Amino acid sequence: MVREEVAGSTQTLQWKCVESRVDSKRLYYGRFILSPLRKGQADTVGIALRRALLGEIEGTCITRAKFGSVPHEYSTIAGIEESVQEILLNLKEIVLRSNLYGVRDASICVKGPRYITAQDIILPPSVEIVDTAQPIANLTEPIDFCIDLQIKRDRGYQTELRKNYQDGSYPIDAVSMPVRNVNYSIFSCGNGNEKHEILFLEIWTNGSLTPKEALYEASRNLIDLFLPFLHAEEEGASFEENKNRFTPPLFTFQKRLTNLKKNKKGIPLNCIFIDQLELTSRTYNCXKRXXXXTLLDLLSKTEEDLLRIDSFRMEDRKHIWDTLEKHLPIDLLKNKLSF
């Protein structure tokens, strides 16, 4: 963090992107400015955003690979230049882009001799490769080579115990951190009592999202983190009061969900994830905190279950219902069956 004195004028608090560039497929850069801030506020915002950007942004990566009958990760496979460990490290570096949650399966199945790159990975429709030229292995002989992969969306750095699994699969330390680096600097402007601060924020990402998208998600996460304090008085009310306040007078939310479940019989609801429903970030995060990742999970919740979710409010319930009616009308059943 750098602090400097510069001349400047005060105006309404605003932010903008002052520089944006793509250095490579796996390196995006963005520079943002927020001003004017009162003395001390720039540090507060800068520290919070840096932590949120580096630790709270979700990413998609390969978490497991199955080679078949390979005794251990230090083994070599005939006809392949790299060892199993080197292949695992190459798979760890693959950058993926996806907005869906849960575990996904992928695979590689090729015949040598040839180079294997990220382009050879057979992915589900919801996942995209950022750089298809990333190397994986080099087949030096005419052999059939197949790997089963597991893909997961998460946040932070996840490690697993190194052990031999009975099915021949090996864990890959998941680095679900799309933001590679964050720097911020603070500049002072004005004179005397009119001094203000300008915050400059630099963000580097791995290409799975842009710096602007990362900044938006980090800001949204920080807002959601402080929401319970804004509604502390509301949550302090008795459950009976909340129940009365949340229940519509003529047609309860639970009855509407029950009718929706009956009408949607036969749809693979466990294949429809809630991030496909265009929920607001607040409503979406409430549902995720209650372990409702799919539409089936959401419809399995009773009204009481929803009311017990932290920060869940009446507008969230109305928004969920309106969104379900919008995306799952009766006349679209056939289309939904094609998921």
Curated annotation (Swiss-Prot):
Residues 264-339 are annotated as: Alpha C-terminal domain (alpha-CTD). It catalyses: RNA(n) + a ribonucleoside 5'-triphosphate = RNA(n+1) + diphosphate. It is found in: Plastid, Chloroplast. Gene3D superfamilies: 5' to 3' exonuclease, C-terminal subdomain, DNA-directed RNA polymerase, insert domain, RNA polymerase, RBP11-like subunit. Keywords: Chloroplast, DNA-directed RNA polymerase, Nucleotidyltransferase, Plastid, Transcription, Transferase. GO terms for cellular component: chloroplast; DNA-directed RNA polymerase complex; mitochondrion. InterPro entries: DNA-dir_RNA_pol_insert, DNA-dir_RNA_pol_RpoA/D/Rpb3, DNA-dir_RpoA, RBP11-like, RNAP_asu_C, RNApol_insert_sf. Residues 1-233 are annotated as: Alpha N-terminal domain (alpha-NTD). One of its GO terms (biological process) is DNA-templated transcription. GO terms for molecular function: DNA binding; DNA-directed RNA polymerase activity; protein dimerization activity. Its EC number is 2.7.7.6. Transmembrane segments: none annotated. Belongs to the RNA polymerase alpha chain family. The N-terminal domain is essential for RNAP assembly and basal transcription, whereas the C-terminal domain is involved in interaction with transcriptional regulators and with upstream promoter elements. NCBIfam families: rpoA. DNA-dependent RNA polymerase catalyzes the transcription of DNA into RNA using the four ribonucleoside triphosphates as substrates. In plastids the minimal PEP RNA polymerase catalytic core is composed of four subunits: alpha, beta, beta', and beta''. When a (nuclear-encoded) sigma factor is associated with the core the holoenzyme is formed, which can initiate transcription. This is DNA-directed RNA polymerase subunit alpha. It comes from Crithopsis delileana.
